Design a protein with these regions (language model features):
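Short amphipathic alpha-helical heptad-repeat segments
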Residues: 2-10
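Structural motif
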Residues: 1-2, 19-27
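Scaffold helices S1-S3 of the voltage-sensor/voltage-sensor-like domain
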Residues: 13, 17-20, 41, 47-48
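A short linear-motif detector with a strong N-terminal bias
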Residues: 8-9, 16, 120
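Accessory alpha-helical DNA-binding modules that contact the DNA backbone or grooves
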Residues: 29-160
Length: 160
């Protein structure tokens, strides 16, 4: 596994925990883990398990998680979160201006769980009822959703 792939696993866990309203320090620990792996100049997967703690910012707990990822390709906590977490919420982070905090707000206040829910809420002008969201953001999100839909449609017409 490449460092970026390993870091993405930690980022996924951090995003799901943050959207789910988990403890700030726990979320930050997973974000720091992703950063430590991403910033490491050589392949983490090529290190012997007993050398993981040589990576700046990696303690015994993170070293154990790294060993699990290298051995299994995933983290048990990520697998468990994916079982219970609405996958559509994670897909929303690919849209501009939507990070975990804003996605949590949308889920909590407007019960948005996926792109379709978001599109309906934007078209109804519901986002502007939330502080920090406005008409301009609604327009940009609608454009992003339309572009995404256009890309998907173009892909479908090209593929047999």
């Amino acid at each position: 596994m490449r460092n970026e792939e390993i870091a993405r696993l930690f980022d996924d866990v951090a995003d799901m925990l943050e959207i789910g309203g988990d403890n700030f320090f726990r979320v930050r620990a997973y974000r720091n883990a992703a950063r430590a792996v991403r910033d490491y100049p050589s392949s983490v997967a090529d290190l012997a398990h007993d050398r993981f703690q040589e990576i700046p910012g990696v303690g015994s707990d993170l070293a154990a998680k790294l060993a699990t990822i290298i051995d299994t390709g995933d983290l048990p906590i990520r697998i468990e979160l994916l079982r219970t977490f609405p996958l559509g919420l994670l897909e929303l982070k690919n849209l501009p201006m939507l990070g975990p905090k804003r996605i949590k707000l949308l889920a909590d206040r407007l019960h948005i769980r996926n792109r379709d829910d978001l599109k309906r809420a934007v078209e109804a002008g519901q986002l502007r009822t939330i502080r920090g969201f406005g008409a301009r953001m609604e327009e940009q999100l609608l454009e992003a959703l339309a572009r995404e839909l256009g890309v998907l449609c173009d892909t479908e017409t090209v593929l047999p």
